[in-house]
Curated annotation (Swiss-Prot):
Signal peptide: none annotated. The keyword Nucleotidyltransferase applies. This is Ribonuclease PH. Phosphate binds at residues 86, 124-126. The lineage of its organism: Bacteria, Pseudomonadati, Pseudomonadota, Betaproteobacteria, Neisseriales. Its EC number is 2.7.7.56.
Length: 238
């Protein structure tokens, strides 16, 4: 039995609370168990310089963690004057994941920036951020459609993410911090609602994993992401 008393194929309790903040065009509090992330989507009527005059938009993301989102206080990155490599890697991953399901031509010459701020961390902050960011993005696009600023919806599909790993030789879904810090293999999987893979990040922590292990982990991730997409759909209809 896992420390959380979950079955190997069981997600933590997942919730998407929409319209969580007042000012953003899209905002969501996403919870994966004790991991909680606020995702806000901001529409900007401009694009980065490399896209000016090209008739297409852009979707990007920023990621950060509050100082006491973890067991002991982390120093704010702003205080050191630069972002860590981990932060840069995660926010690029979130942006890539969102762009995979957006028709940037249909978005027009505007940019949507999704900020993902971790307020409490218990493992899986990047996968929770991606799953919540999609809901915030979808709400922001709904607002553009309602105002008549878009003639076609540029959102092609859902995107969601989950972690999987090998713990004591067993594939498990949605690792919390305790499992993540002691697992043999850690993998983050990003998929679309139609089952396409956007990104797979997998690392062995000392014990190599086999091809059979990888297939089992991907099957488990597919099952979990289908459930998360269903929860995204339910949240969007509420």
């Amino acid at each position: 039995m896992r420390p959380s008393q979950r079955a190997a194929s069981e997600l933590r309790p997942v919730r998407f609370i929409r319209h969580y903040t007042r000012h953003a065009e899209g905002s969501v509090l996403v919870e994966f168990g004790d991991t909680k992330v606020i995702c806000t989507a901001t529409v900007e009527e401009s694009v980065p310089g490399f896209l000016k005059g090209k008739g297409q938009g852009w979707v990007t993301a920023e990621y950060g963690m509050l100082p006491r989102s973890t067991h002991s206080r982390m120093r704010r990155e702003a205080a050191s004057g630069k972002q860590s490599g981990r932060t840069q890697e995660i926010q690029r991953l979130i942006g890539r994941s969102l762009r995979a399901v957006v028709d940037l031509q249909k978005l027009g010459e505007r940019q949507i920036v999704v900020d993902c701020d971790v307020i409490q961390a218990d493992g899986g902050t990047r996968t929770a951020s991606i799953s919540g960011a999609w809901v915030a993005l979808a709400d922001a696009i709904d607002g553009l459609m309602a105002k008549g600023l878009l003639t076609e919806n540029p959102l092609r599909d859902h995107v969601a993410a989950v972690s999987v790993g090998m713990v004591d030789g067993q594939p498990v879904l949605d690792l919390d911090y305790t499992e993540d810090s002691g697992c043999d293999t850690d993998m983050n999987v990003v998929m679309t609602g139609q089952g396409g893979f956007v990104e797979i990040q997998g690392t062995a922590e000392g014990v190599p994993f086999s091809r059979e292990d990888m297939q089992a982990l991907l099957a488990l991730a597919d099952e979990g992401i289908r459930a998360i997409v269903g929860l995204q759909q339910a949240a969007r209809q509420s």
